[in-house]
């Protein structure tokens, strides 16, 4: 059962990927008005960003009740983040572990910047809730995806803007199988199919072949995690071991 809070409005960090798409559905089921926010920070491909409009349009067609709640979409040019980053998310380099144990897909400061800009937009537009797809269960060790980070950031943003934002991370303690299950709980098989077909997770931007779990190369860490989570969801299992 999803608790509804119809008097509140939310801004969802929406990249066009599976996690943020599920968070968007979660917010649409919960809040009266929901706006979306994406960032172009010089990613190595634009496939995920290009999925954003298609998923939003598909949700409007498939779920009329949500269509009335879905508000404006915002796209922010954050190319400065790509300019100061040297990662596999912003450069054509092999995906591998670095000396500190983190994969080189980690973009330092990314979620901190995303949430800070989201808060500034929400402040201007009178939105009370910020929603992000950060997760500490199925993740690669990114420090800016941790629950402690998000809680500390909520405090800092509220102090710095003298407001009472609520930072919601509905996937924080879910594995990928649970994320597929949440989509089913929110919108049934139709939403699961929209997430499968209309979103993109692959680090390499491969969208030539539609697999059972969605589009992707099938080999990068993001694809393997998505694939394994989908298979576990179909089998009714949990997936908590690292890929």
From Swiss-Prot:
The keyword Metal-binding applies. ATP binds at residues 14-24. GO terms for molecular function: ATP binding; ligase activity, forming carbon-nitrogen bonds; zinc ion binding. One of its GO terms (biological process) is queuosine biosynthetic process. Gene3D superfamilies: HUPs. Zn(2+) binds at residues 202, 217, 220, 223. Its cofactor is Zn(2+). Keywords: ATP-binding, Ligase, Metal-binding, Nucleotide-binding, Queuosine biosynthesis, Zinc. Pfam families: QueC. HAMAP family: QueC. This is 7-cyano-7-deazaguanine synthase. It comes from Paraburkholderia xenovorans (strain LB400).
